[in-house]
């Protein structure tokens, strides 16, 4: 069952299969989800690794300027960060417990703060009141006279007053102590608030340059960090959950945790990601936190705080602690100083009343000073000494005098004496120290200062030197570090890309394997089902074929090819065809998985009988239909019985035995109402067999039409001629021409109540496929009795408009005529079968699965072919197709010989081919595949890319045919450096006018006359130096012999009169010839030209050997001796001298100048002698006239004066033959010899035509390109081969005349044809040689072209030559064509081996032994 039916629950009993399928799909989906989760974890880990890499770079950059201690500090910071991270992980593990503890601790702190606030307020009020009272007492003490005591006491008294007595344990704390304690408590109670205020002050100091918006964003960031509840070290207040910043109730109530709504968490995370949009804030804060991962299994949100922010907060904390410590010390010192002042004021106040109220005591000097209390211990290093050591730090002070008593009882006088003695001793010691040690210490201090400054200078220079070294080293380190960092980034990027690519490939491979496995399983199930369906449909078709074959006896015509399996099949004779057709078993309603073979066979037999009954009923219905009343009611061919058909009498020819059998087969098909395909090999008379069946219907059953014949345009006239020739009684309507002509012709069938009898306006209408498409609306209105489609491969595409229009015609029977039912693929055979039996062959996909794939793969790769399947295919095709081949039915027609002539590219062709190949080197394999896989269809369904490839293939084929298809050689000539003169009006002149040489060189040279007269002429004509004259003129072969002075000098030696020699030297050459001809009796007419060429040793002197004029009486003798060997001799030996004259006796210039010019014009000023002599030497009027035709006036004058009768001087080209070939002008015409040798095919064709012409063969040459035909016509004209041409541009009437001329005129040597235009339906049996200059995509087109000569009426051996270029596109095309031909042979003839085609390499030696037609 299909996947769609399985999922939609359309099949019954498929629950288990559906559950298994869904279970497999769920497992695959779970595996895909698991892979996706692993991929997400991998991406998170890669992101963390990249962050760590950035942090390492930041640390490395920051550590460049660190010292050893700072590096240690950084290392300790890293360790503390690691400890914090471990603590954070521990916090993540026990988060719920820690959060509960933090909340409880926070609540307790809030309660304690609320309890301490009233006490703190009271303490502040008391301290404020005490401060007010102290200030009041101090003002009073200042007003009292305490100066004597201060003067007496001096510095020691002040120092003693600064020391306060210390109470014993258990005693009440003095007021000063209580005040200090209160201050300390106050400080301790407000410590956290002070820290918070100091932190806020620090932040304000740092952000005083920032905007208010950035400060608000920072505060929001800190609040959000506190909301997320980040925990760090327990001692780190900045990161502890109980941070100093107070939380509002709203914050606590709206705080998010991991159990909050996912939408709120996402919104908060989005807020955190969108913070600090300004670049300045981002640079300062770096980042607040990064959400690493949300673990849905443990419901936790992992957050990471960057180390840079951690260091900033730790530094702030250290600074705040230092500030608090300094403030506490300053407050303590201030409190102690304030307390000492308060004690002194109290002591002074007590002593003053005692002196006023107790005079007895003041008068007595025996007042003792007792020890009042233990002195207060001093702090050492900030720690108070223990109570166990009551040692006094200072001596006791007498409260009355304020002098020290040193623990003894003494009077005030004694105390003052001791004080004076102490002061004297103290001053003496200081004086001695100042006198003795001050100078020494001063020198020592100066020396130490100088040494220190020197050391400072040395240290600074060393430091500067080391700093410079470090700076240079640091630059190199930075550069190396950057290089290493870039390399590391590249390597890391390439590594991860490689891993990602490998993982993607693995993932895709796994998915592809899973899909392939599922597809394979589905294909196995579908193949089993299709096998049963195939067996059902084949059985149905074979039974149908059996029913029809029993009626039309196809086995008797083609031989017994029945399938042996039908003998063991159930008895089909039991099926009664007379019963009405039962319900048809539709294929899609049959369950091929559950039905057994017997039931399937029964249903197939039922379907076959139904199809046959429907076909017969359609034929009966057509015969029973009438356009109006009883029209065509006389047609009832099915009532005739089975009889043996004889040749119709109205057929004006004698059918051969196999043609008569074909007539019987066609008649039986008509009786059964079945359409057929007459697929006899080309040349066996398909046309006459189809005409004979029309004649049979007209003669036997009085059915005279209407018949329609559809044929290609090239065979329209041939059909008209054949029908008129074989059945003269038929009236033919040729339906083609322009629109007006066709409109007139349609009147023949637009009449109502028209009966088609012998007297009907027409019986057979002949038209083309183009007319069918254009006038389909008119032709479909007619009810055609019989339709004949000639060359039915024209409807090989079921998608074409031809096929659709013809299928919609109302026809009783259809007959397809084709010699090649299969041209490119099995699809074309299916299109023809579907056209004749649409109900039986309705699915091309099934037909392709059954037969096409197996047969086409066998042809391409030579795989094993299923013979049983091939026999079943033949059994199916047998009722509808009749095919005979020539060698089986006609023994007098021999096999044709096919020869592939392989040529090598010429140098120019190879260069062009390589250039084209280099331009498409990337897709050259695709182009070759296109060349080998192209079917050559004309459907026009190729895509844009396919059309581009085919255009490129066509360019390669042009190179193989001839390079001139790209660019023709042109006439070349040098630059003409000249100026042309202009003549006056010639209206006043006679019939002949002498025109001087008008071209002149633009460069002219003016020669002074003095130089010409005195230097040139005397030296040339003077005979003073006889020796020089003789040596340089007489004895030199290059000296002129017409010097009058020299002749007069030598006349005495020669024995001739000087006047005679002078007269001869000054006469013109024509005059001398006339005189010689008229007055010399020794010269005969036949010896005139022997005098010119000096071949005859006559009695004439050397002076008489000049140019003579021929006479009409001796014209033939003159022509005989005009050329070297004689014209007549050359005409009698043309073949022998052809190669010598054309190839060996031709001289061509090796160099052609780039520019040409006449000689430079020389003018002698004041003299015309030089100009006259020059013009007479170069442009003698008599000589120039002698080179052309002599005017009648001159002939008359010469005849009257000299009695010389002549017509004209001979044509110049006859003097002599090699001259016109040995010398040529600078104007170069394209060489035909080079034109021939630059194409390998044309070169071999030239050699082959010479041999074929010698053997009196007649040749058909087929082309694919009309431009190539133009080039070949030039070649044939050059070789003077008589030829005619037919291509697609030829008109219909011209085609008929060309074919008639070829068949009747034997002097035509070559017939040039286009393969598409001249390869269908025409008879060219006068030719015995076929040459394919370039092959068609479709091998069937070439086969049809061959059969124009190899067909009935051919009495000679037919030889086919195919010119191919080795190692190119053409060779690939030829291999593909052989595969297509093999498919045709397998299907139509049952052959499994290819035809034997000879392949010959066309080098010089092998082509000589090339077999020629007999």
From Swiss-Prot:
Every Helicase ATP-binding domain range: 667-839
Gene Ontology biological process: CENP-A containing chromatin assembly; chromatin remodeling; DNA repair; positive regulation of transcription by RNA polymerase II; regulation of TOR signaling; subtelomeric heterochromatin formation; telomere maintenance via recombination; transcription by RNA polymerase II
PROSITE patterns: DBINO, HELICASE_ATP_BIND_1, HELICASE_CTER
Keyword Membrane: no
Sequence similarity: Belongs to the SNF2/RAD54 helicase family.
Record's subunit section: Component of the INO80 chromatin-remodeling complex.
Name of the protein described by the UniProt record: Chromatin-remodeling ATPase INO80
